[in-house]
Each structure stands twice: as C-alpha cells, then as structure tokens.
C-alpha cells in the first residue's frame, strides 16, 4: 500500500467508512458511498479519481478480486489518498 503523507494522514482531515461484507456482498453499499461523498464535498477534497474509485461496481470488483466472503472493507479518502483495506 502506497500512502502519501498529507493533512488527512497527519491530522485526520479525511473521511472513512467501514463496510460489512457478507457472502461476498457489501452491506448497505450505496448508503456508505453517499455518506463518504457528502463528507468529501464538505472537506473540499473532491477529485475525479475519487469519483471513479468510489463507484459501486469498482468496489464490488475489489471485493471479488480478493475473494472476500465475510469481513469488513475500510475505505479511507484524504486529499492525496484513496485507500482500501480488509
């Protein structure tokens, strides 16, 4: 994982969501994405890459590529980072 030092990593200026995964599906995915996008707008850290990476189909692909059946996916967005972690 390549993490860039920015105000989000140093001071917590960013948004995150922890999404439950059951039977390979993200639970309440659209609600999580909507909440993240709202926070991203409020912090003024919107950019096209964030919109692409937070597309529901991209998130579902990430889950499938890792064969996640159960667990949690954490998504962190800061000014310079978009991180996905199990």
Language model: regions and residue ranges:
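Conserved alpha/beta cores of soluble small-molecule-handling proteins
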Residues: 1-86
């Amino acid at each position: 994982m390549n993490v860039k030092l920015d105000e989000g990593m140093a001071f917590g200026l960013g948004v995150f969501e922890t999404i439950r995964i059951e039977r390979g599906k993200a639970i309440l995915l659209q609600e999580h994405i909507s909440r993240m996008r709202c926070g991203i707008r409020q912090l003024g850290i919107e950019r096209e890459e964030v919109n692409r990476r937070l597309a529901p189909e991209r998130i579902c692909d990430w889950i499938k590529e890792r064969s996640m059946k159960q667990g949690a996916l954490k998504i962190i967005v800061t000014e310079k980072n978009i991180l996905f972690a199990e």
